[in-house]
Structure formats: C-alpha cells, structure tokens
Amino acid sequence: MMMTQRISPSNKRRRVSFVRDFPQFSVKDESDIGGDDVATIKENLDGKEDSNCVGVAYRDHHRPKEESFDSIMKKAGFNVANGNLGNGKFPPSKRNVPLPCEGKVQPLSVEEGIKLMAYESQRRRCFGKPLVSTKVVQKHRYSPAKKKLSNATALRVRHSPMKKLSNASRLRANAHRPTQHKDERRSGVLSVIQRNRLSKDLTPRQKVQEVLRIFTLVFDELDRNKAARRGGSETAKSRIDYQTWTILREMGMQVNSQKRIGSVPGIKVGDKIQFKAALSVIGLHFGIMSGIDYMYKGNKEVATSIVSSEGNDYGDRFINDVMIYCGQGGNMRSKDHKAIKDQKLVGGNLALANSIKEKTPVRVIRGERRLDNRGKDYVYDGLYRVEKYWEERGPQGNILFKFKLRRTCQPYVDF
C-alpha cells in the first residue's frame, strides 16, 4: 500500500513571476522594440518560460526618449540622406569627458548642442567654407622639394585678396599708434624747434643765419641721442645731416624754397656752411646727392648751381678765376672698373651745356676738407659763367665731359 505524502498548502509550490532586465544591445529588427524598451519574460520557479506572460516594460519610464543622430543633424539644418549618416545607430547616453583642471564647466545639453550646430551651419552658408583654425608651425629645415612648395604657397598667400585686406587693416590699425622710440628721439628736437621759431620781422640775411643756427642745434641733438642709444662716442656721425634736413623741411623751417638763377637773398659770397644738406635748407643748392642742380627756363634745362668737392676722383681744378669742372655720372667713385661707364650729355651735364647758349650764371660752392679731417666745409664762391665744354678720356679710360667756367667780378674769397 502506497503511502501518500500530504502536502500542506503552505508548502505548495506557487507560480511566482518576476521581471528579468536584459542589457541593451543591437537587435536585428529593432523597429518593434525601442532603444529604451526592455523585453520582459515571466518565468515560473521551474525555469520554464511562460509564453502567456510576455510583455513590454520600460526600464526607466521617467527618462525622455533619445533621438537618433540623423534626426539631430536634420534639426540643425543639414541635408542628411537616409542611411548616409549614423547608420541607424544611437549615440551613447552618457559620455565620460574629463573636465580640464576640475573646472565648473558643464557639458552642453541636447538643446544647446542643436543651437550650436545650427549656428555653425549658418556661418558655413554665409562664408562658403567652414572656419579653419590657425596652427603655429615651428621652424625647421626644409628639403629642396619642400622649400619650393613652401615658396609657392607663400606666393599664393601673398597675392591673395584676403592677405591684402589683412595687411591694409593692419596698416590702418597701426596708422595712429605712436611709436615710443620716435617720440623719444624727437622729444628734444621738437623742443629745440619750438624755442627757435622764425620771426616774420627778420630780414632775409637774418632768416638764413637763424635757419643755419637751428640746423646746427637739431643736428647736435640728434647726434647726442644716437650716441646715447649706441653707447659710443658723440663724434661718430652717419648721415645725421640728412635727418636734420628732413625734420626742418617737415616743420616748415626752410627759406628760399623756390629754385632761382643767380644770387640767393640772404647769402653772401664767402659764407661757410658746415653741412651739404644745409645748402638745401637755405636755398643755395637743392641737389643733396647730385653735384649739379638745374631748373627749366622755358623749354630748356639750365644749371643753377654746382658743388665742387675735392677728393672725389673727378679732377676739378681752380686756376685764379677759372674753374675746370668735371661732369657728373659714370660711377667714377666705384672700385669696380667694370661698373665705370662713359658719361652722357643728359641731366645736369645737358643743363650746363645749355647755360652756354642761354648765358645764365651758375652758383659755385666749393667743398673743402676740414683741418681735423672730420667732414667738409662748403663755401659759397659766387657766380660763374660757363664758357665751353668738351669730351676727354679719364684715368679709367671712360669718356668724361669737362666744363670751363669763369668767375665774374665779385669779392675775392681766401681758401
């Protein structure tokens, strides 16, 4: 007889259902199940699936449904074709981005990201291309091929309209920006000029003397500033007379500013001038770099003044009241014999030749070396008449033009 064990109701196996949360993964056909949907299956205690108790539940019902990357890009204004971007994949819901230096910068939200992408899209449509950030490239040695490529790139950038625009903008920005070193250099010069203004009541002679005095003061001030910056001796000079001439002209301190034939008001025969650039400030000789100064008389060029300087390899000679003057040009002072060329009857040489026919006087300034060999003194020797000219071979074998001038009745100057 078989004994039947009685089972109490408390020990009876009950059918208990529970929800198993499966991890999220890609599903072949995910159109039926959303990205945040979780398939739940009810099982009994025997481990058998209960097909009658299968349903869909939300794992996190309070979270908003994430959008695909394609939909976000479409909202931003991009033309995204189906299947070309994103491939149906969803961006991760969380990204662990380390914040620099543990700052308080918060990551962008979805709405802020959409606005940012829309703004960048708008800028691309306006300017035609995306913004390119500049990178600092360290200098390194280039191979010949890379050097040619870099030179070609530099030429394209140099001639591009954007480069010209940037240079123009930079020049406009720096146009009114004062430079400190120029202000420091001219602070003393301007004070000298302000204290020594020319008066309208002065005679022509007084104006010439006053301008020459101011020229010397400004020259000395520039010479001291240059020696202080260089840390050297004050006796070293490098074309400071040209700088002084430029400053006085800019400040309107020039007298006898118009070219003329004959004598100049305020200047007497025998006047000594320390600098060649000062001859232009007082209107005696305007050609700072040239030895012959000329102007137009009608349709012809005639000479107004010449500067004869000894030691310039031109062979100028003075015999009593006669002067033999060598024409200009031909690179006579060049050490390269191949650079020496024949002089031509143009410019100042032609003006001296025309003065013979026009019978116009020429002012002659003689440059004499100082006793200390520190520069030259320029002495006004008076008016001369050009009598004739001719060609001859110079010491280097090139053709030179020689002019004979004779001094008219004027006070004698002792040299």
Curated annotation (Swiss-Prot):
Main location: nucleus
Annotated YDG domain residues: 262-407
An example Gene Ontology CC term for this record: nucleus
PROSITE patterns to which the protein is assigned, alphabetical: YDG
Keyword check for Nucleus: yes
Bilayer-spanning residue ranges: none
InterPro entries xref list: H3K9_HMTase_SUVAR3-9, PUA-like_sf, SRA-YDG_sf, SRA_YDG
SUPFAM superfamilies assigned to the protein according to its UniProt record, in alphabetical order: PUA domain-like (SSF88697)
Claim: Magnesium is one of the keywords in the record: no
Disordered, as annotated region: 163-186
Subcellular location: Nucleus
Domain of life: Eukaryota
Keywords in alphabetical order: Nucleus
Designated name of the protein: YDG domain-containing protein At5g47160
